[in-house]
Amino acid sequence: MSRLLVGLKLAQSHYLSQLHKYPVATKAVTSGFLYLISDSLVQGIELSRDKDKKYDFKRSMRMAVFGFAVTGPLFHYWFKYLDKHFPKKSYRHAFIKLTIDQVVCSPVFNFLFFSGMGILEGKSKDDIVEKLKKDWLTTYVSDCVVWPFINFVNFAYISSIHRVTFMNVCNIGWGAFLAKMNSSH
């Protein structure tokens, strides 16, 4: 057991070191990995319900690419922007940040998600527009139910260097929801 704890402590130390040295790259890799996990969880559930279905590795890789290329970098810079304009670690500033996030970033992020996934899937512009019409609003409304509480905790209690990591861990469930929404026809 002590070897496991030592190994975990070393992994944590290495991760924190990389987070300080290469914040955007570390957050991008973390996001990509956790998006891969999210989609794998969804597919695992789908496979348990439909024995004829096969694991879609390309689908999981598209999720990972989106997490890596968009989610990690976007939220690194977005949270920096919010911290610059609302620097106090107070409940008031946490509430302001989460409100701005829900009104500005969340709708844009959900648009980017469905558009980006459509592009990665090789869909036509018309197909992407149809997907947005079908699922964007439902996803945004769900986002408004789930993320305000998480973001309040994030902005009020989590240090700025760890905000994207915290969001990514919470995002495992949300990423699974997004994967399910994106795979629905």
UniProtKB/Swiss-Prot annotation:
Main localization, broad class: membrane
Record field: transmembrane: 63-83, 100-120, 141-161
Keywords of this entry: Membrane, Transmembrane, Transmembrane helix
GO CC terms: cytoplasm; peroxisomal membrane
Membrane disposition: Multi-pass membrane protein
Cell compartments where the protein resides: Membrane
InterPro entries documented for this protein: Mpv17_PMP22
One Pfam family, short name: Mpv17_PMP22
Recorded family membership: Belongs to the peroxisomal membrane protein PXMP2/4 family.
Protein name per Swiss-Prot or TrEMBL: PXMP2/4 family protein 4
Native organism: Dictyostelium discoideum
Upper classification of the organism: Eukaryota, Amoebozoa, Evosea, Eumycetozoa, Dictyostelia
